[in-house]
Every structure is written in C-alpha cells, then in structure tokens.
Amino acid sequence: MVCRELRNLLLAAALALAAPWAVAGPASSDEAVLGAYDGYREGDALKLARYAKRLEGHVLTPWLDYWRIAMRLEDTPTPEVRAFLDQHANTYVAELLRGDWLKVLGKHADWEEFERQLPLYPRDDLEVHCYAALMEAQRGEETSPADTAWMWLDPHELPDGCASLAQFMLDQERVTVTDVWRRVRVLFRNGQITAAKTTLGYLEKEDSPDERLLADAARQPKRVLDRLPRNLERRAVREVVVLAFLRYARADPEAAAKLLESHLAARLPESDVHYLWAYVAYEGAREHQPDALKWYARAAHEALDEDELAWKVRAALRAGNWRVVRDTIDLMPPMQRHESAWTYWYGRALAAQGEETGSRAYYLRIAGQTDFYGLLASEELGYVEAPPQSTYVPTEAEVDAARQNAGLQRALELIRLGLRTEGVKEWLFSVRYFDDAKLLAASELARRAEVWDRSIQAADRTVRTHNFALRYPLPFRDVFTEYAKTYNLDVAWVLGLVRQESRFISDARSNAGAAGLMQVMPRTARFVARKIGLRNYMHKGVTEIQTNVTLGTGYLRLVLDQLGHQVLASAAYNAGPSRARRWRDATRPLEGAIYTETIPFSETRDYVKKVMANSVFYAALVQKQMTPLKARLGVIAPRGTAEPAEPADPLPEDELP
C-alpha cells in the first residue's frame, strides 16, 4: 500500500513538472516507469517486466535493464552481467552494477573475474577496497591492520567485505591485541558501541574485558571512573577505563580534565595519559572551554590526530594566541595544512607576528577563489572585488549538444519523474569530466528545465571560465524581494541562505522534516504562522512558494531581532538560537570569521561560511555592489553584552533541519 501511494505521489509530481524540453512520452509512459521502479523496490520481477514491456526505446531503458539484473545479481551468470556492462559501457548504471558485482564476486571469492573487473571500477568504495585487499592477502601478500588503516580505523560498523578481511587477518594471526583496542577506541569516540563490541569479539577470552565493566563504560562511565578497578596493570581492564574516560569527557570535558589530573593520570601509562589529554582538550575546544589550550599543552604533539590539531588551532584563534595558531598548523600533515582555512589563518598568524611579506604569500595561494576563505584572502590583500562578470555564456549549439547527451537526458528525466536520488547520481556521473564550457552548457540546460540544484552544481565546478548568473541564480526573485522588504531583511542574505538551504528546489524535503525553499520545520512553521498572523495555515501547504517564503523570512526576522547579527542568525537558522548564543565568547568580542570557524558542528560551520559568501555575490548581482565579506562578518559581541531580552515565547529549538 505504501509503495502504491508513493508511486501515485511520484506520478502526480511528474505530471505537474512536465516541461516541453523533457524527453518524455505520454502520461502512460511515466506511469510505466514508476510502476517498474515499484517492482524493483518491491523485488517483484513480474511487475517490473510487465511495466518495462510498455517502455521499449524509452530514454530510461538503461535503468530498466539495471533494475532487472540488479534484482537477481547473485544468481546471474557471468556472461549475462558482462553483456550488460558492454551494452551500457560508459554509463552510470554500468558503473553502479560493476560495483555491486565486485562485491558479489568478492563474497564468493571469484578472484579471477574480480581482478578482471576491478581496474574498470574507478570509485572509492570501502567494501570493494576490502575485497581487493582480501584477494591479495589470500594470494600470500602480507596484509596487516597497519597496511589497511583506511579500513581498520574507519569509525563505523564494517561492511561484509571488510569484516571478511578482518577475520582473515585474525585467522592468519596478523591482528594484535593492540590493533583491536586501537580500533575499539576509534569506535567508542564516535559512539559506535555495537561495532566496538563486535571488534572485541576478535580477542581471545583471556584478553577480553569483563562484559559488565564494558557495559558500564558505555552507559555509566562516571561509575567506572569513580570506582577504578585495582588491577589496571591488566590490558583489558585498563582499556575499559580509557573507554569510560572517552565517554565521560565527551559529556563533561571540564570534569574529566579534573579527574585525569587529580588521580587517573597516575594510574595509567604515559602514552595513555597523552592520548586522554589530547582527547579531553579536543572536546574542551569544541565546547569553547577557556582551559582547552592548557589541556592541549599536556598532550604530546605526536598524540594529536587531524581533528585534534584543527581544534587546537580553533581554540588558539578564540584565545587570540597567534603563536599557537602558527605552531599548530606547522604540525599538520601536508594535505591538511594546505586546506584553504589553514592557509588563510597561517597568513593571519604571520601578519599578527609582523611578517607581512610572508602573510601576503599565503593569501596569494587562495586569493581569487570564490569561497569563504578565498574572499577573505583577497580582502586581506586589498582587492576590492567589482561585481562579478560572467566571462562565458554558452552558445545555443553548446546547449543543444548538452541536450543530446544521453546521461543528462536520463538525469533530467529521472528528476522530472520524482526519482531525484537516481537523477542526481546520473547527473554527477555525466558531468564529472566536463570542461568549463560543457559544464556551463549543462548548467544552462538545467536552468531552462528549472532544475536549479543541478544548474548550480555544474556552474559551481568551473575552474577558469565562469558564469555567475548561473552559479547564483535568481528564481522567484520577486517573491524574495517582496518578503525581504516586508520583514526589512537584506535580500542578498536571504537569497544566500536559500541557495544553501534548498538550492531553490521548491518541494525539497529533508529527512528531519524541513520543507520547501527555506526548509521550514513543522513546529517552526506553526510558531511563525501564529506570530505573523498567517490565518488558516495548514502544514500540507508549507511547500507552496508564497507560504514558504513568508514563513522562512518571518522566522529569519524573529531570529535576527533576537540575536542582532547576520552571522548569529544564520547559525541559528541551521542549529537553533540557543546554540548560536552559546557559541559566542564569554567575555571577549570575536571576529565574525573566528566565530564562524569555531562553530562546533561541522555542518553548521560549513553552512554559515557558504551563506555569508553567497550573500556577497547576491549583493553584487541584485544590488550591484560588493559588500566585503569581512564587513558582513563583523564582530560578534560577548555573551555578557546587553542584547534584546529573550521573549516570553521563545523560538523553537527542538526540530532542527
């Protein structure tokens, strides 16, 4: 019943979105595609075949063929799979099926065919990598957890192929007790308790921890730490205490640091003490604890992983300690050190220490890039950007060539039919090797189809030749302008936020329930509707464009009134007003860029960077002026500063997109 209702909804959406450019037949063919898709999802081969019979020559024939063979791949003869791969060579569905087949081949140890297909599969797939390593190990290659750290230290439950590799290494006595506990620590740090218990199953009984003590470490870590076992010289007992500390430090880093300093450090080996100081400092930095740098100082540099190094830099930024910023970035591995964020902050650290020539050299590495730190670096060099000019407009011949591209046809058709996940993957595959001109032609094709997210994605990828009108489109411009004026909001900021929220997909829905152009949550929508006097509001209409923009801009106005700053309001729109307030410093004003870089949630940190950078370009396109990003970021006042009182009717916090 659910699948039938889903099919009907998808069909209705497809008919509503039908456009003259689309490669689509009559409604009956739309119904047949969705019916075939239902058959595939339900595992009903007869149903799939019945609908597929009506679709001979359809643009989505490769997908119909894929659905048919994928349903029975375990039992499909090798010649038939090879025939599919040859028939659909250089398509997304061929790559998809080859990945599926490699896992089947690995599962059945058909290494001859696996080795034949592996070079033809370019994707970075963890399970396929594991089967490749298992093949080599079974042929006598020396394979250990150190050789397969990319798998062994993955912070999730291992897929079947990786579990098989781990078991083989265990059977060959290539896994040590230290290897097992190293993986368990990674899993505990990431809350993967079930996977940690699975990994502990690799240990011999005499090396295994007490199950009750392990359960307490996961659920009641303070209890374990308050009643330290006497026999800490035993590895299994000591490791469980370390695990308990990891859980406790995540919840309360300040209390954990006091406990470590007062008595726990004296009971543990020096290497474990350094490891725990590094972790408690990391968690303290994420909570903006003022003592985080002191805790970092008690950990050996060698004990810090990439995340811990990044948060040491962030803690130093909040403390204004430019020497530690510079020294810590110097400790980063080369790939991390060359990321645009650390390139910019290294330049700032050099400037703060009077090394202006050196700082300019670092800014020049990323200046001209159109992202958050590229803009800031350009501004540090004194480059005041003029409103961006599109350097390339695709010709009609180029757009027509994009229209004839079979992969793009399939992508847009899948999206039109409501099969967005499949359509997006088809699109990404199709444009992956496009040069700038082809990317912009594909972007223009998607723009004409009003598939705004794909248009933006293609235009965003250009390297030398750009089209900012495609990269920063203005659908529904009049609606956004009207409501930005109604609520006295900067329309460039609103557009920058919507570009990040939904990519202008009017019927977008998140897994959390956020809906529409401005990704309004259900409870937030009801709250704002009541606040602004939107009468007879029904949530089923939340994706209607006028309604959604009314609610979204109304909420943005309420948040801005409470927090008084676009950076704070942007963070609040993504993660809630209370968090945005809490992330300010307790006593010191912070640069807006430092506040943004030190947001604890990586999703929100990235979100605010993109919203604020987007706003710069939308101001240029809509208002014909470039307000520097640094000016938009401004300064964030400390928590103790006088601000508007929190209303008696606080904004919703419990349903975040």
Model-derived features with residue positions:
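Generic helix N-cap/helix-start motif at coil->alpha-helix transitions
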Residues: 24-32, 43-44, 56-63, 75-76, ...
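Alpha-helical adaptor scaffolds
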Residues: 68-70, 85-86, 98-103, 273-288, ...
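Structural motif corresponding to the intra-repeat A-B loop/turn of tetratricopeptide repeats
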Residues: 42, 71, 75, 104, ...
